[in-house]
C-alpha cells in the first residue's frame, strides 16, 4: 500500500469521524443533527433528508418542510422517537423543532460522546496502520524490500498515522469547545 493510498484511506476515516461529530448537538440548531433519523415511509425506512428539506431559520430552530405533506405525521413520529430528545411542533405544513439550550450536565455527556467517537476514529486509523505495516512486512518477507527499506516504510506509515491522529485530536478539541461554549 503506497503512502498516498494510506493517506486517502485515513482521510476517509477522518471524514467519517467528522460526520459522527456533526451529529452531536452544540448550543446551536444544526440540520445535521437529524442526519441519522430514518422515517418509516410507505413501509420502508427512508432517511429524513430524502423526504424533506431541512433548514435552520434561526440559531434555536430547525425547520423541516416535507416534499409530501402525507409524510408529515411519520416524520414527526420518527423525530419524537429518536434519541435526540426533541419535541417536534407540527403546524400542518412544516415541522419546527426548538433546540433548547444545553444544560451543563448534557454538555458533559456530549463531550464524552465526542471523545468516544474520536477514540473509534483513532482505532480505525490504527487498524489502517496495522494493515499497511503488515503489507510492508509481507513484502520484506517476499524479498521485495530489504530490511532497511522495510523499516523506512514502516516509519513513514507511522508518520502518516501521527499526522492524522493530531488532526483528529484537533477536531475533537474544536468540537468540545463548540459543545462547552455557552
UniProtKB/Swiss-Prot annotation:
Transmembrane annotation, as ranges: none
Q: Which GO molecular function annotation, any one, does this entry have?
A: ribosomal large subunit binding
Q: Where is this region: Disordered?
A: 136-156
Q: Where in the cell is it found?
A: Cytoplasm
Question: Which keywords describe this protein according to UniProt?
Answer: Cytoplasm, Protein biosynthesis
Q: Classify the main location.
A: cytoplasm
Provide the GO biological process annotations.
translational termination
InterPro entries hit by this protein: Ribosome_recyc_fac, Ribosome_recyc_fac_dom, RRF_sf
Name any GO cellular component annotation: cytoplasm
Q: Is the keyword Protein biosynthesis in the record?
A: yes
What the entry lists under Pfam families is as follows: RRF (PF01765)
Query: What does the record give as the function of this protein?
Result: Responsible for the release of ribosomes from messenger RNA at the termination of protein biosynthesis. May increase the efficiency of translation by recycling ribosomes from one round of translation to another.
Report the family membership: Belongs to the RRF family.
* Protein name, as recorded: Ribosome-recycling factor
Which organism does this record belong to? Synechococcus sp. (strain CC9902)
Lineage, top ranks: Bacteria, Bacillati, Cyanobacteriota, Cyanophyceae, Synechococcales
